[in-house]
A protein has these predicted regions:
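His/Asp/Glu-rich metal-coordinating catalytic cores
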Residues: 29, 40-215
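Accessory, non-catalytic peripheral segments of nucleic-acid enzymes
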Residues: 219-283
Length: 283
């Protein structure tokens, strides 16, 4: 495919890949912690695509527990599409719970009613259900994360004090996991969208026994990967060694990347060298 077309379809391809993995792994259920849609996007083909993918999970007998985040709350698509019966949406009016009796798992969550939800939603979440594995689903960057808007702010200590065993968080695009008595996890987004979202992207496959997380496996779903490659060219006398060093660095990056995965790379040259003036006009 042409690079521009591949970029345009990458996010959908990544989501379809996630559904494929869920079916192949025969997961018991899927959790989506918000931002299916991109704000005020009005492309209903995106919504229809999402419904089709949820239908594939329904056919495989996989329930989905979906929480709407800030972008979903402002999306017209969210209000207009009818989802398959296997998709259970957390209410925006108050925190609600869904039980999976066969697995003794209960999920607690609250969707965003409006995009700019700046109140701490956590006090409204119910107490943990004794003897069950309690999962909290929340769309938040937590407090003190300057890189993200202050939506549904709360602290890690508040999450831990709630008494749930696992927190499935959305909003933050970078993957991050904190393990301990309570597991707090952002899987990040499924597909990097631009150069500020570099490296592998994907989801988390969580394994649980009784009341504890036994394994967290990273599932890579990106179909095109962004990378920022910094090359130190200090001391280069002319552009020839610069080109050679960049080529070597790119070769190493390609060796470390799955063969099927296209790369979009920004190369940054650092260091003082005599080749600086020559390189300024080089393309």
């Amino acid at each position: 495919d042409a690079p521009v077309e591949r970029l345009r379809t990458a996010t959908r391809e990544a989501f379809e890949g996630l559904v494929n993995l869920a079916i192949d792994e025969a997961v018991d259920f899927m959790v989506i912690a918000g931002d299916i849609y991109d704000g005020d996007c009005r492309d209903f083909n995106t919504g229809l695509f999402f419904v089709r993918q949820m239908g594939r999970l329904r056919q495989a007998g996989i329930p989905v527990y979906l929480l709407y985040g800030n972008h979903d709350a402002e999306s017209e698509i969210t209000k207009s599409l009818e989802l398959p019966e296997n998709v259970h949406v957390f209410s925006a009016r108050k925190a609600t719970s869904f039980r999976l009796d066969a697995h003794r798992v209960v999920l607690h969550g609250q969707s965003f009613r409006v995009a700019a939800t700046e109140d701490n939603l956590l006090p409204g979440y119910p107490a943990p259900l004794p003897g069950w594995f309690n999962i909290g689903v929340l769309h938040t960057a937590l407090e003190g994360n300057a890189a993200h808007a202050r939506y549904a702010p709360c602290s890690p200590g508040e999450l831990q004090a709630k008494g749930y065993q696992y927190w499935a968080l959305g909003h933050v695009h970078e993957p991050r996991v904190e393990r301990g008595d309570v597991t707090i996890a952002w899987p990040g987004n499924l597909q990097g969208r631009h150069i500020r979202e570099c490296g592998p992207r994907g989801a988390l496959l969580v394994s649980v026994e009784e009341d504890r997380v036994t394994d967290l496996a990273r599932l890579e779903t990106d179909v095109l990967r962004w990378q920022l490659l910094t090359v130190d060219v200090s001391g280069a006398a002319n552009r020839s060694p610069v080109i050679r060093q960049v080529g070597q660095a790119l070769g190493k990056l390609l060796d470390e990347t799955p063969a099927h995965l296209p790369l979009a790379v920004r190369v940054v040259l650092v260091g003082h060298c005599a080749a600086h003036r020559e390189m300024r006009g080089f393309e």
